[in-house]
A protein has these predicted regions:
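Rhodanese-like catalytic fold shared by cysteine-dependent sulfurtransferases
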Residues: 1-20, 27-57, 66-103
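Short, surface-exposed ligand- or partner-binding patches at beta-edge/loop junctions that are enriched
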Residues: 61-62
Length: 103
């Protein structure tokens, strides 16, 4: 079973800081809105396992959660410690949301 976290729980993880937060959406979507400290690795550019640390947990998110679940399953099968944000960025309403409107 794949580990998931709620959008509300994500703030706690961000404050802890001991993970990589990966946004799987396009560069354009990332520029419009993303979660602070996220690394943008669009799905098409993500070579499973390439350039990803295996010694710290990964938290993945996408627009609604389905894409991040699929990618997380493949990464978990390769031995990565990975979680996904249920509902993706659409569900996130925490204080770390960065958008073009609030820059």
């Amino acid at each position: 079973m794949l580990d998931t976290i709620s959008a509300k729980e994500l703030d706690w993880y961000i404050e802890d800081g001991s993970f990589w937060l990966i946004d799987l959406r396009s560069e354009e979507e990332f520029r419009e809105m993303h979660i602070r400290n996220a690394v943008n690795i669009p799905r098409g550019e993500l070579q499973l396992g390439q350039h990803l640390p295996q010694n710290i947990p990964l938290i993945l998110y996408c627009e609604r959660g389905a894409l991040s679940m699929a990618v997380a399953r493949r990464l978990a099968a390769k031995g990565y410690r990975v979680k996904t944000v249920v509902g993706g960025i659409r569900a996130y309403r925490g204080r770390y949301l960065v958008s073009e409107k609030n820059r």
